[in-house]
């Protein structure tokens, strides 16, 4: 008998067949045993979300990098350092936010001794959707910020285009609003547009801060 598709009471663009329950700590323990896609095999560990379980604001990134894979926490590498600076400039306290990623394992390509970041494919993103849904259902944030195109399309659908719709507020279900902005890692790769993209990130985060007041 096919599994019933349940429309989640969470703001995701696509339905999730099953949403795990429990506290954030319990969800983190459950996620360690996830074998829904092959990314767990080469990864050091699952990188689950972190922050207050009743946070008003949730920031959703794309996928862990090398430092996150080693330390087991989201946004602790170079992109996380840039995010910390942008949050401070925008007047947001990182300790009051719930930070997570769309995908919970580090995907990489081995080049000699180096592990080079590789984007998770659609099937891998879909396999992780239940964990993001569980985080959203448990935290129930009022404001959701997608950092990067992967997170934005997970929230707003595959037709969403970050270059056109960045910084625009959208209604997410009955209880939340959301917006998308640049992922700090994209800014780090931005070269000649780096400064402009960073200013836009800070401006968008200031809009988040104002909305939360």
Show where each model-derived region lies.
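A polyanion-binding, active-site-adjacent surface
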Residues: 2-213
């Amino acid at each position: 008998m096919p599994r019933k598709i349940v429309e989640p009471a969470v703001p995701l663009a696509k339905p999730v067949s099953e949403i795990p329950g429990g506290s954030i700590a319990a969800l983190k323990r459950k996620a360690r045993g996830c074998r829904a896609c092959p990314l767990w095999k080469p990864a050091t560990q699952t990188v689950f979300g972190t922050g207050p379980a009743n946070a008003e604001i949730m920031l959703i990134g794309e996928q862990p990098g090398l430092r996150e894979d080693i330390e087991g926490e989201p946004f602790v590498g170079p992109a996380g350092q840039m995010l910390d600076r942008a949050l401070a400039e925008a007047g947001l306290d990182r300790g009051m936010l719930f930070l997570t990623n769309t995908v919970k394992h580090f995907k990489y390509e081995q080049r000699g001794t180096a592990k080079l970041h590789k984007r998770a494919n659609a099937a891998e993103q879909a396999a992780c959707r239940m964990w993001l849904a569980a985080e959203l259902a448990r935290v129930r944030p009022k404001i959701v910020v997608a950092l990067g195109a992967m997170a934005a399309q997970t929230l707003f659908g595959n037709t969403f285009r970050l270059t056109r719709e960045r910084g625009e507020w959208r209604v997410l279900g009955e209880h939340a609003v959301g917006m998308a902005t640049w992922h700090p890692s994209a800014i780090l790769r931005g070269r000649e547009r780096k400064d402009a993209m960073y200013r836009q990130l800070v401006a968008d985060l200031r809009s988040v801060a104002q909305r939360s007041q």
